[in-house]
Regions:
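Short, charge/polar-rich alpha-helical segments
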Residues: 2-27
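Heptad-repeat amphipathic alpha-helical coiled-coil interaction surface used
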Residues: 17, 23-26, 30, 37, ...
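Acidic, low-complexity, intrinsically disordered interaction modules
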Residues: 35-99
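Short acidic DE-rich linear segments
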Residues: 109-112
Length: 112
């Protein structure tokens, strides 16, 4: 499971935990945008589309920042390859966004 692999590699590393926290914040923001998307009118979607795209880009950037750090610490970070890269297949962008929504969901459940 990708999330379990992430958490194992992050461990108690304070810098990795900070990067993970930043990722969770942007993932939660992105998930909120996605959750409301179907409730928006066409006009509202048009107005908010660039913001959604920007937030999605930020999610990808934060995943990459965490991976870069973990690799510098000698971790495999193979979970990032499992998510895929937009450059290899445009569909991977959607998968990364979906995984960000999953992270926000898990975070919400754990907040009980």
């Amino acid at each position: 499971m990708i999330h379990a692999e992430m958490l194992t590699e992050i461990g108690a590393d304070l810098e990795a935990l900070k990067l993970y926290d930043e990722l969770m914040k942007v993932a939660t923001r992105y998930a909120a945008i996605r959750a409301n998307w179907l409730l928006l009118s066409r006009e509202e979607k048009s107005e908010q589309d660039s913001g959604r795209t920007s937030c999605h880009n930020s999610v990808i950037t934060h995943f990459n920042m965490l991976v870069r750090y973990l690799k510098q610490q000698g971790k495999a970070a193979a979970w990032r390859d499992e998510l895929g890269y937009e450059e290899d297949n445009p569909y991977n962008r959607k998968a990364i966004g979906d995984f960000a929504c999953y992270l926000a969901f898990v975070n919400g459940i754990n907040a009980r």
